[in-house]
Amino acid sequence: MRTAIVGAGLQGNRRASALRLSDGDGLLLVADIDPEAAQRLAQEYGCRATRRWQDVIEAEEVEAVLICTPPHLHASIAVAALRRGKHVLCEKPLGRNPGEARRMIDAAQESGVTIKCGLNHRHHPAIRQAKLWCDEGQIGEIMFIRSRHGIAGREGYDREWRARGEISGGGELIDQGVHGLDLARWFLGEFSECFAFLSSSYWEMGPLEDNAFALLRTSGGQVASLHASWTEWRNLFSFEVFGREGYVKVEGLNGSYGTERAVLGRRSPSAPFRERVIEFRGEDRSWAEEWREFVEAVAEGREPLGSGRDGLMASRLTQALYESARTGRAVTPEDLA
């Protein structure tokens, strides 16, 4: 699929690499307000560069757009691309709020094209294995989920665009917490009640949180707890699902998060406790797998895994948790839709 990337920073480079791994020579154009950044990435992949994202929209040969900009630009770029009949994969969060995400979905539906939210964690092999075990009924009915995702930040983190709410839409909850919210919803379904505490423990970013603590409950009483942190000091990813007959755990994402592995534990009162462990070593191919599945979804005319609606629902949960933290009360996401 003939593709353009808007945003030549860390995520733009990561997405370009993933595109090459999964789609050959499909990158035609790179746009970034920093012309040197755009040119560097374009030279590496043998394509054209521009500093105007509007040039991407106007390029008739471009079939799909990868949006890798800060969140405040997501909606305007995506809506323009979708209205010109281009498919879009937009980095998370889909929008700074549900209204922006809704505009993108409406534009896609009106034009008959595909909008996808960048939720690459769904494509980590350990996550996929854990989901398979749950779907097979290996741990019985799910009772609760515990999700932890933490990074250390870096020098000057509080001076990056993430520290400006008008650009980012929020702090750690909307940045990394979105992944845990999306996975919890993928495993459990819709949540009817949300409660959150937010704190700024270390990074001086005004009203924005560097730690988010959340509890979410389904109408059936299943609970997900989530902690997303910019003060973990050593990168950590842990996603645990507990059922009536056992549990599954995902630990690590490779690289700085440690070896990625999926663990299945079965409850057996009459026998020695046993775990099955599968390790997934090597480079992180979740970005390439996400792009490959997106291309297949477009070709097959179906919703991709991590669809625009999934991005919208993650945005609604995020908004509900921010409202809960503000008011000190549990919030029903549907009331804010």
Spans of model-derived segments:
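N-terminal Rossmann-like dinucleotide-binding module
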Residues: 1-45
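Beta-loop-alpha module in the N-terminal Rossmann-like domain of NAD(P)-dependent dehydrogenases
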Residues: 15, 45-107
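Active-site loop of classical SDR/Rossmann-like NAD(P)-dependent oxidoreductases
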Residues: 33, 279-292, 306
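Hydrophobic residues in well-ordered beta-strands that form the structural core
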Residues: 51, 67, 89-90, 115-117, ...
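C-terminal helix-rich "cap/oligomerization" subdomain common to oxidoreductases
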Residues: 64-67, 295-337
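Basic phosphate/pyrophosphate-binding loop/patch that engages nucleotide-derived ligands
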Residues: 106-114, 128-143, 243, 247
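Predominantly a Rossmann-like dinucleotide-binding segment in NAD(P)-dependent oxidoreductases
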Residues: 121-206, 328
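Contiguous beta-strand/loop segments that form the cofactor/metal-binding neighborhood of enzyme cores
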Residues: 182-256, 288-301, 337
